Amino acid sequence: MNFDVSIDYLLIFIRCLQVGNAWRRLTDDSNDISWIAAGYPEGNTSELVFKAEGSGGMPEFISNLPAADVVWGAFKVVGVDNRGNTISRRPKYIFVKYLPGEVPTMKRARAGGHKGAIKQIIDAHIDVEIESASELTEEVIIQKLRAAGGAHQPTGYEFSNYSS
């Protein structure tokens, strides 16, 4: 048995577990995590690693996007349906593939091939692919959520500072 290969696969598995655990924290309503980010470790495009998480919603997620590196992440948006005496709150999860124009061609190609595997870990309501943080706006997300939703649409959305 080649232990080097086994250890490499084990490390990749553990790192994917870290991303999966971050996803579970994001979707667990008992904590205040509202976004997660994953990417490649420095100088390696064959592994996915957990990078960061936070509680500041979409604005904080955007502020943590690097200028020139690949990020896969997700954040929570709360759909609020206020119909008089009944208020319903439902979390929606947004998957983001961030691939800035400054990323080298080979790294871009590798990132494109990894999206399917990452989507196996991060299973969100909608997907957004962006090259610039300025492309990620509340209006874009609301439009995609409304297009993906059924007949019963929320009356509004919260992107941070989720009220109870």
Question: What label would you give each PLM region?
Answer:
Residues 1-164:
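Long, low-complexity regulatory segments enriched in Ser/Thr/Pro/Gly and acidic residues
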